[in-house]
A protein has these predicted regions:
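Expand to "…catalyze enediolate/carbanion chemistry for C-C bond making/breaking, isomerization
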Residues: 1-158
Length: 158
């Protein structure tokens, strides 16, 4: 398991991400083949739920595109389920405080870094039985700073 976004960012280059708001696995598959660095399945404002996201993430797995998800909320259950499904990046909305951000990050990573529980059924199928050993180094966690409160707390959040 290797997340190519980290290689792109180490070279101080920009990565190009596509956004999927409508639940359609064919569209996800097509976007995966178009050369995007990553594709995000939007579960917050898009029409995607967990069930529709499964097929979309499966379709993206047949490409060199990094599958990502914007979750509906900073909640451990859906974050961990999406990571177990095999996404390599989570975007969390409404991160307003340092505490919000610390909780979010902890949900994305296995101990000792975080508190993610172990259950990567599909992720192990896609990335191998040693997924657990490499996951923490290959998961992107992006916090959305989108409110006045978050901007006021930005230094503390970072």
């Amino acid at each position: 398991m290797k997340n190519k976004l980290f290689d792109i960012w180490k070279q101080e280059k920009a990565s190009i991400n596509a956004w999927l708001s409508i639940p359609n696995s064919f569209t996800a598959e097509a976007f995966g083949k178009m050369g995007w660095d990553s594709v995000t399945v939007d579960m917050q404002h898009g029409q995607n739920d967990y069930s529709s996201s499964i097929a979309m993430i499966q379709a993206l797995s047949n490409s060199n595109t990094v599958p990502m998800t914007r979750v509906p909320w900073n909640e451990p259950g859906i974050i961990m389920k999406m990571l177990d499904l095999g996404v390599q990046g989570i975007i969390a909305p409404m991160i307003n405080t340092k505490d919000d951000c610390e909780k979010f990050v902890s949900y994305c990573y296995y101990p000792p870094i975080g508190q993610r529980s172990f259950g990567p059924m599909r992720a192990q199928v896609v990335y191998g039985s040693d997924y657990y050993q490499h996951a923490n180094k290959n998961i992107v966690s992006l916090a959305m700073i989108e409110t006045k409160q978050a901007v006021e707390n930005l230094d503390e959040i970072l």
